[in-house]
């Protein structure tokens, strides 16, 4: 909320302040396998440091593919295949966001997803390099589809729900989840990462 620089990548100046995130992505698409990133997260509450795979599809209501999604009722079936590691976050054990927790998510589409809140062995806002990894298994006749999530070599969680199948691009980025209007101005300014009360932060 304290950022006063140029607006980049968005087209609005909101009363709560200017928020400009950033992301990089691979040009190529990659399928199931082991994904590992060594990174220092942005060490401030209010911004989400994220590592994710993403593949996006839209199917018009008149298309054959639309019929594969009978729970969709709009003009388009929007399908986003995604695997996420996001920090910081809050979970049932914490009233406020903390770097002692992360979100591990798997998506087949917005209403077919699993979000898991995981306590970490140690806080990761210590300015040190940490290794974030997920092993993506799409499964076969002998193996159940799953995603195994690791931090610093320790397996912390396995998701068996809504496991993506198509090849995806790998993304690294920082963004600002806003879900609660804490100051009553009509705009969400405090999300599950906290309030963004800083000028700049680096992931």
Predicted regions and their residues:
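GH16 jelly-roll
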Residues: 1-203
């Amino acid at each position: 909320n304290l950022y006063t620089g140029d607006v980049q990548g968005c087209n609005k100046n909101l009363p709560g302040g200017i928020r400009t995130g950033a992301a990089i992505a691979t040009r190529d698409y990659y399928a199931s396998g082991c994904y590992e990133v060594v990174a220092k997260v942005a060490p401030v509450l209010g911004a989400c440091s994220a590592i994710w795979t993403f593949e996006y599809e839209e199917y018009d209501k008149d298309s054959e593919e639309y019929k594969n999604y009978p729970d969709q009722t709009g003009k388009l079936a929007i399908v986003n295949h995604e695997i996420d590691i996001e920090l910081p976050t809050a979970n049932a054990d914490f009233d406020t966001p903390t770097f002692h927790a992360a979100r591990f998510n798997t998506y087949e589409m917005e209403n077919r997803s699993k979000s898991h809140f995981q306590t970490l062995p140690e806080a990761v806002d210590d300015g040190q390099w940490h290794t974030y990894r997920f092993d993506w298994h799409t499964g076969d006749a002998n193996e159940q589809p799953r995603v195994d999530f690791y931090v610093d070599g320790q397996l912390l969680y396995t998701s068996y729900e809504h496991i993506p199948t198509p090849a995806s691009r790998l993304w690294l980025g920082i963004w600002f989840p806003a879900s609660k209007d804490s100051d009553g101005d009509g705009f969400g300014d405090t999300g599950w990462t906290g309030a963004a009360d800083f000028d700049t932060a680096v992931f």
